[in-house]
């Protein structure tokens, strides 16, 4: 992968470390080198005590604040699309921070324990909170068990589903903070709806 390439956690940087020395922001798995943080690939060299040239490859945040604002970071509020739902996680794609829409979507996981505050062992199925193709407002957070992807949380009241559709592609309307209704069939479904701040930019019904 070329220097200055934008990478996310879990992205492959090199097939093998080869001539490089591994620097910060990287980890090795199955002899391949992957990014452990979001940032830009950087390569630099220095002379060791034997005057040999050592090349180091790393992933680091840009010194340009405008570049950093384009990357998901711990504590950032992002808009994401739910791609699939399992027993322990929902797989999501981060699509924007505020009004900045990414050309590249960043893969993320929404763990079951990040759905509601103070309820780490939820007995309810995932579908009571989010479903595939929902758009959610979420916070980027940390999880000691997940190191190769962004981790999302919708535990706070302001976070959750902001846009969803029914089985026929019709818009679903909010009944209350835990329920939506189909504009076509009148059938209700459970969701954890976000109590969205007024200044927050949200996806529209035209989003695919």
Swiss-Prot record:
A GO BP entry: rRNA processing
A GO cellular-component term linked to this record: nucleolus
Key word rRNA processing present: yes
InterPro entries registered for this protein in UniProt: Csl4 (IPR039771), Exosome_cplx_N_dom (IPR025721), NA-bd_OB-fold (IPR012340)
Expression sites (tissue/organ): Ubiquitously expressed.
Subcellular locations according to the entry: Nucleus; Nucleus, Nucleolus; Nucleus, Nucleoplasm
Keywords: Exosome, Nucleus, rRNA processing
Protein purpose: Non-catalytic component of the RNA exosome complex which has 3'->5' exoribonuclease activity and participates in a multitude of cellular RNA processing and degradation events. Involved in regulation of antisense ribosomal siRNA production. Involved in response to cold-warm shock.
Subunit structure comment from the entry: Component of the RNA exosome complex.
Protein name as catalogued: Exosome complex component CSL4 homolog
Lineage: Eukaryota, Metazoa, Ecdysozoa, Nematoda, Chromadorea
Gene assigned in the entry: exos-1
């Amino acid at each position: 992968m070329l220097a200055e390439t934008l990478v996310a956690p879990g992205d492959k940087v090199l097939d093998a470390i080869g001539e490089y020395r591994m620097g910060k922001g990287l980890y090795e798995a199955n002899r391949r080198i992957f990014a452990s943080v979001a940032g830009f690939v950087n390569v630099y060299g220095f002379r060791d005590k034997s005057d040999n040239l050592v090349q180091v490859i790393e992933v680091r945040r840009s010194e340009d604040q405008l570049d950093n604002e384009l990357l998901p970071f711990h504590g950032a509020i992002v808009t994401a699309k739910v791609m699939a739902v399992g027993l322990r996680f929902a797989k999501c794609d981060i699509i924007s921070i505020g009004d900045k829409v990414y050309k590249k979507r960043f893969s993320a996981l929404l763990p079951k324990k990040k759905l509601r505050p103070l309820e780490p062992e939820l007995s309810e199925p995932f579908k009571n909170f989010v479903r595939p193709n929902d758009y959610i407002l979420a916070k980027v957070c940390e999880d000691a068990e997940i190191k190769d992807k962004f981790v999302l949380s919708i535990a706070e009241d302001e976070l959750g589903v902001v846009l969803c559709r029914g089985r026929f592609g019709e818009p679903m309307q909010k009944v209350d903070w835990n329920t939506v209704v189909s504009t076509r069939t009148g059938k209700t479904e459970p969701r954890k709806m976000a109590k969205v701040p007024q200044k927050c930019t949200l996806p529209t019904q035209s989003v695919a």
